[in-house]
Design a protein with these regions (language model features):
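PLP-dependent amino-acid enzyme catalytic core
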Residues: 1-436
Length: 436
C-alpha cells in the first residue's frame, strides 16, 4: 500500500519509506492511500480472541501487503506482551487501562511496534551497516516509551528532546537514565519548542545529507496506527463481558491527537464505535475549533495533565484529512470538552472516594467528559493512558494518600541522570547533531 502526504505536494511512498522518513518532504503527515474494511466474520469472533490475535488481524489487514505475515506476527506478538484490561468503574463507564506495559503508559504500544518495524526495515535497507537516528519530542510519556522501546535496537540511535522542568521526575528518569543508544536533550523551552526543533531538523538539507533521520512521535505512521489495536480489544472485552455494544462512546485524553486519530481509523475499518470525545485540559485548541470552525494554534499552557500540554497538535492535519476538511463531518463524530486543573483534581478525588478507582490526571479528563456527556443508552469507555504513580506528587496531594510506586517504575529512579542541556534555537541543535 502507498502512503500520501496530507499536504499533497509530494509523490506517494511505500510503508518502508513512510516509516524511515517519518515526515513527508512537503512537511505533511503520511496517511494510507486507502483504509480497508475488516470482514464481518472477524467481528463475529472477536469476543473470543486475545489481544495479540486481534491486533495481528488488524495489522495484517493494514500492513499485509508490505510485510510478510510471519514477520508481522512476530512484531505484533513481541510488542503486545502485556495485557490491556477493560475495568468497570461506575454505571455504564469503563476504563481501558493502557498502563500495563514496560513504562506504564499507552505509548508503549506504538513505540514498541515502531521500534521493531523500524529495526526490520533498516536491516532490509542497509544490512547491518546503516544507522537510523530517531528524533522524538516529548511532553512526558512519549520519551520514556520510545526510549525503552528502542533501547538496544541495533542500528538505531534515539535523541529525546524534552522541556526542562516540565515533565515529572518519574517520567524524566525513564528516559534520562538509560544511556546506551539513548540521548536525552533537556531544552530550555516548551514542548512546542521541542517539536519545532524536530520538524526543522527533518527539513534541513545539510543535516539530512549528513545522517538518516526519522521521528518516533505520533507523526510517524508506525507509531500512531498500532494504537488502533486496543480500541478493537476494548470492544472485544465488552462483548465478552456481555455488555451493551450498540452505542459505544470512547473518550480520549487528547494532546497531539495521535491516539484519537488511530481510533477514528479503526472506526473506518469497521469498528462499531458510535462517537468519540476529544477530552482536553486547558489547552483547548481542538475544542475551540469544534465551536468555531477555525483552527488557531496558540502557545501551550502548563497543567497537571502535562502530556496533553500541546498548543498545536500535529495530528490535527490527519483528522482534517480523514474528514476531507469538513467541520460539519468532524463535529458529527467527535465532540470536545476542556477542563481546568481544579476540575481535573476534583474529578480524581471524587471518583476515588466514591468508587475506589484511582485516576491519573489525563484519565480524569476523559472520565469527567463521560460523566457529563454520556446518555443512559450509551456505553462509555475512557482511555486511562498512564499509571497514576507516574504523577505521584500530584495524585498524592489530590487524594490525600501516599500511593505506592510499582516496582518497574521504581527501578528507573535508581539510575543516574544523563542529559545534554540546550536552548530552543535550531542552530545549536543542528550543530550538536552534526557532531555526533
Amino acid at each position: 500500500m502507498k502512503y500520501y502526504s496530507t499536504n499533497g505536494n509530494t509523490p506517494d511512498v511505500s510503508l518502508q519509506t513512510a516509516v524511515v522518513k517519518g515526515l513527508a518532504a512537503d512537511r505533511g503527515l503520511f496517511m494510507p492511500e486507502r483504509i480497508p474494511l475488516l470482514p464481518k466474520a472477524f467481528f463475529n469472533n472477536i469476543g473470543e480472541m486475545s489481544l495479540q490475535d486481534i491486533s495481528y488481524v488488524v495489522a495484517n489487514t493494514l500492513f499485509g501487503d508490505d510485510i510478510e505475515s510471519a514477520t508481522l506476527k512476530d512484531i505484533v506478538y513481541d510488542t503486545l506482551n502485556f495485557d490491556i484490561p477493560l475495568k468497570h468503574v461506575a454505571d455504564n463507564k469503563y476504563s481501558l487501562e493502557l498502563f500495563h506495559g514496560p513504562t506504564l503508559a499507552f505509548k508503549d504500544v506504538g513505540a514498541r511496534f515502531m521500534a521493531r518495524l523500524l529495526g526490520y526495515f533498516n536491516k532490509q535497507q542497509n544490512g547491518n551497516g546503516g544507522m537510523v537516528n530517531v528524533l522524538v519530542a516529548t511532553s512526558g510519556d512519549t520519551g520514556s516509551a520510545v526510549a525503552n522501546g528502542f533501547l538496544g535496537v541495533p542500528g538505531v540511535r534515539v535523541f529525546v528532546l524534552y522541556p526542562k522542568g516540565k515533565v515529572s521526575l518519574i517520567q524524566e528518569a525513564q528516559f534520562t537514565t538509560l544511556g546506551k543508544n539513548i540521548t536525552a536533550i533537556e531544552v530550555d523551552g516548551t514542548f512546542d519548542d521541542c517539536q519545532a526543533l524536530v520538524k526543522s531538523a527533518f527539513m534541513d538539507e545539510e543535516l539530512n545529507a549528513h545522517m538518516m533521520l526519522t521521528s518516533a512521535n505520533s507523526i510517524n505512521v508506525a507509531r500512531f496506527l498500532p494504537q488502533m489495536f486496543y480500541y478493537f480489544y476494548a470492544y472485544a472485552q465488552l462483548l465478552k463481558q456481555g455488555k451493551d455494544v450498540s452505542n459505544i462512546v470512547v473518550s480520549v485524553p487528547s494532546g497531539n491527537f495521535g491516539n484519537i486519530t488511530a481510533g477514528l481509523i479503526g472506526k473506518r475499518m469497521g469498528l462499531p464505535i458510535k462517537r468519540f470525545i476529544a477530552a482536553n485540559n486547558r489547552n483547548d485548541i481542538f475544542f475551540q475549533y469544534l465551536n468555531t470552525g477555525v483552527y488557531t494554534p496558540k502557545p501551550s499552557v502548563a497543567t497537571i495533565a502535562n502530556a496533553m500540554d500541546v498548543g498545536d497538535p500535529s495530528n490535527f492535519a490527519r483528522v482534517l484529512d480523514l474528514y476531507k476538511h469538513s467541520h460539519e463531518a468532524i463535529c458529527a463524530e467527535i465532540s470536545g470538552c476542556t477542563y481546568t486543573d481544579e476540575q481535573i483534581g476534583e474529578t480524581m478525588a471524587k471518583t476515588y472516594k466514591e468508587t475506589g478507582y484511582l485516576l491519573d490526571p489525563h484519565g480524569a479528563v476523559a472520565y469527567r467528559s463521560l460523566e457529563e456527556g454520556l446518555a443512559e443508552n450509551e456505553t462509555g469507555i475512557f482511555l486511562e493512558t498512564a499509571h497514576p504513580a507516574k504523577f505521584k506528587s500530584t495524585v498524592d496531594a489530590i487524594i490525600g494518600e501516599d500511593i505506592e510506586i510499582p516496582a518497574k517504575l521504581a527501578a528507573f529512579m535508581q539510575g543516574d541522570k544523563q542529559t545534554v542541556e540546550m536552548g530552543s534555537g535550531f542552530a545549536s541543535f543542528k550543530k550538536f547533531l552534526m557532531s555526533v
